[in-house]
Curated annotation (Swiss-Prot):
Protein known as: Large ribosomal subunit protein uL10
Gene Ontology biological process terms from the UniProt entry: translation
CDD domains in the cross-refs: Ribosomal_L10 (cd05797)
Coiled-coil residues: none
Keyword RNA-binding: yes
Gene source species: Edwardsiella ictaluri (strain 93-146)
Function statement: Forms part of the ribosomal stalk, playing a central role in the interaction of the ribosome with GTP-bound translation factors.
Entry keywords, A to Z: Ribonucleoprotein, Ribosomal protein, RNA-binding, rRNA-binding
Subunit field text: Part of the ribosomal stalk of the 50S ribosomal subunit. The N-terminus interacts with L11 and the large rRNA to form the base of the stalk. The C-terminus forms an elongated spine to which L12 dimers bind in a sequential fashion forming a multimeric L10(L12)X complex.
An example Gene Ontology molecular-function term: structural constituent of ribosome
Designated gene of the protein: rplJ
Amino acid sequence: MALNLQDKQAIVAEVTEVAKGALSAVVADSRGVTVDKMTELRKAGREAGVYMRVVRNTLMRRVVEGSQFECLKDTFVGPTLIAFSMEHPGAAARLFKAFAKDNAKFEVKAAAFEGELIPAAQIDRLATLPTYEEAIARLMATMKEAAAGKLVRTLAALRDQKEAA
């Protein structure tokens, strides 16, 4: 279906607005994936706070121009599905990585985080970022472990001091 100028401007405006609030972006080629599988992916994306859209490459180049995602310009070749992570930087990468594992025809092209291009081979860097809750839990576990270790060392020092006396 041909898009007129107003439709193109509306798409660019919508996706640009989403890109401004996004933490990261992932670009993939969804050629050969069934409609049912894509529907499942979109549903999982909505639940994970990921905005997904298939947009013409020329329009996507306009969207990313001057933004933190400008490094993705060269990946807009062929059928392109773009996903913006709105709540957590690794959400879209995790979603696409898991989907690609189950669907051989789905290919992740690249990702962008804080203006840095992350090639598809290194997508794990972004996908394995802990969520805010996971990071807090790890920090608390480390702090708790350090306090317990300090207590054990203090008790051992007291024991050694009493044995020496």
